[in-house]
A protein has these predicted regions:
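Alpha-helical recognition segments enriched in aromatics with Gly/Pro capping
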Residues: 1-33, 48, 120-315
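N-terminal, positively charged nucleic-acid-binding surface of large information/translation enzymes
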Residues: 12-104
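Charged, low-complexity surface patches
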Residues: 43, 89, 117, 205, ...
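General small-molecule cofactor/ligand-binding pocket signal
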Residues: 62-64, 110-112, 262
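Short, glycine/charge-rich beta-strand/loop segments that flank catalytic centers
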Residues: 67-71, 93-96, 106-121, 139-147
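The substrate-binding groove and active-site-proximal loops of carbohydrate-active enzymes
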Residues: 78-85, 109-115, 234
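Active-site-adjacent, His/Asp/Glu-enriched structural segments that form or flank metal-binding
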Residues: 81, 99-105, 121-131
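CE4/NodB-like, metal-dependent polysaccharide N-deacetylase domain
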Residues: 91-106, 110, 218-227
């Protein structure tokens, strides 16, 4: 590849040059219940720019993106609006792909949901269980991090801070009976009114991180020293999601998951963090309905360093 791209790894802080002619890239996709807000758009525009540069430099790039179509927020929203979670997911995926087309984002080679990846997920969980890497707690299956020493050796933040952030971002560090506060959930037992799959280790559905492990490893070619070249997403995924994904993939393959972790900044609105809880999300589709030029939206979101946060204003 001519003109290698140099990017900073989010964990090591080192600048790494991508010199290989073959690149694989996995970017975490949406949970299809509230798409597409500007935070989504900024993330996928960032990786669209990386994708386009690598293509123009002569690299053969394989790009995969997931759809988190099994997740608590999706089920909660479906109940709130009185619809089936599958219908809600389908509608939101359609809206998201339309928004990405308007913003001129090149589609990934693989765009795969959790539901259609369930056989692979179950196989990977069974493999970890057979290797003695898991334990059961009241019907739920956890990864035993004491069997993964590199987790604590390479932890990218102080242990107590990791526990706090883990709890804020979907983890359960204080659940009684866990061996380690940071042990991640691999499989949760089935609950009423939720989708469930029958397995040898109990009926239920997967945890968040193993979903991305399965989709990434099953849709991207192995690149040698690591399983993939680039793992990407918003900076809110740096920990725990991407770190946990890397540890679980390493437990399966015996080598590092990604050569390079890339995280882009967050989008705020009028001086505040943009979030669902604040109710201040700005949606691409509504901007387009109001007559905003999609190329102007693209330019505005790319007019910053990709790692920097951006404060959006509707003025």
């Amino acid at each position: 590849m001519h003109s290698p791209l140099r990017l900073e790894d989010s964990y090591s802080g080192k600048t790494i040059a991508l010199t290989s002619d073959e690149i694989s890239m996995y970017v975490c996709g949406i949970t299809p219940y509230d798409a597409t807000h500007l935070g989504h758009a900024a993330t996928y525009l960032t990786f669209d720019l990386i994708n386009r540069y690598l293509l123009s430099a002569g690299a053969k790039i394989t790009f995969s993106e997931n759809i988190t179509d099994i997740d608590d927020p999706l089920f909660e929203r479906a109940i709130k609006v009185g619809t089936d979670w599958r219908s809600l997911a389908t509608d939101q995926i359609t809206l998201f792909t339309s928004d990405m087309t308007e913003l001129r984002v090149l589609p990934p080679h693989s765009y795969r949901g959790v539901v259609e990846s369930m056989d692979v997920i179950i196989d990977y969980v069974e493999t970890m269980k057979a290797r003695g890497l898991t334990y059961t707690l009241q019907g739920d299956l956890y990864l035993d991090l004491s069997q993964c020493p590199s987790f604590f050796e390479d932890l990218p933040l102080p242990h107590e801070e990791a526990i706090r952030i883990f709890g804020e971002r979907g983890g359960d560090p204080f659940r009684e009976g866990k061996r380690q506060a940071l042990d991640p959930l691999l499989w949760r037992k089935s609950e009423a009114n939720e989708p469930t799959w029958r397995t040898s280790f109990g009926d239920g559905r997967p945890g968040w991180h193993i979903e991305c492990v399965a989709i990434a490893l099953s849709t991207l070619p192995d690149v040698g020293r690591s399983s993939i070249t680039i793992q990407g997403g918003g900076s809110d995924l740096r920990f725990p999601h991407h770190y946990m994904t890397g540890i679980q993939a390493q437990a399966l393959t015996g080598k590092s998951f990604s050569q390079l972790y890339i995280h882009c900044g967050m989008i705020g609105l009028d001086g505040e963090k943009m979030s669902k809880s604040k109710g201040n999300l700005v949606f691409v589709s509504r901007l387009l309905e109001d007559g905003r030029n999609p190329n102007a939206i693209r330019l505005a979101l790319l007019a910053r360093h990709y790692r920097d946060d951006l404060m959006w204003s509707n003025d």
